Amino acid sequence: MKHFNYHQSSEIVFGTGRIAEAGQIVKKFGNRCLMVTTPDKPLQPMYERVKNILTGAGVEVAHFDGVIPNPTMETSAAGANMAEEHGADVILGLGGGSSMDAAKAIAVEATHEGSAWDYLFYKEPAPDPSKVLPVVAVSTTSGTGSQVTQVSVITNTAERDKSALYN
């Protein structure tokens, strides 16, 4: 398979073995990374490999592995707390759409008052783009395309509702 790069508001880095570049890519945005994943045991070796790539590039990593399918406000809050405690200046979403959605919600919630739910689709006030932590997305599945959009879908279990964070 040929390698290629494509840029349209999101840069796409694609090709066999390109995960080795993750550390240098993340380092462009910060030195303290919160890696956001599901807790899946079979994926632990991949998570460790990516952590090693990041630390090899001089990036300090905290691993939030509390993502569930259809991430909830509670997921976002727990991840945002970990990001704040770690002093994260960049978020890495690693996995499928749920990890990506959680990473983007965490990037907002860690830097804004209230919860990610407070910043839903065209709800005021909108998140301040200059405060939102940068998100690097590494997709391990095909599906929603969450890795190339700014949209994050989260679930509010108390209201039994699911909506998009998109502003």
PLM region descriptions:
Residues A20, T111-N167:
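A glycine/threonine-rich phosphate-anchoring loop and its flanking beta-alpha core
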Residues A88-I106, T140-S146:
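Glycine/serine-rich anion-binding loops at beta->alpha junctions
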Residues V50, P69-T75, G95-D101, A126-V132:
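Low-complexity, flexible helical/coil segments
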Residues A62, L92, P134-V138:
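Hydrophobic/aromatic beta-strand patches that form the interior of the parallel beta-sheet core
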Residues M1-V90:
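ATP/NTP phosphate-donor binding region
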Residues E85, I106, K123:
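N-terminal loops that bind phosphate or other acidic moieties
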Residues V50, A78-A80, S99-H112, V148-V151:
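Short Gly/Thr/Asp-enriched flexible loops that form oxyanion-binding sites at enzyme active sites
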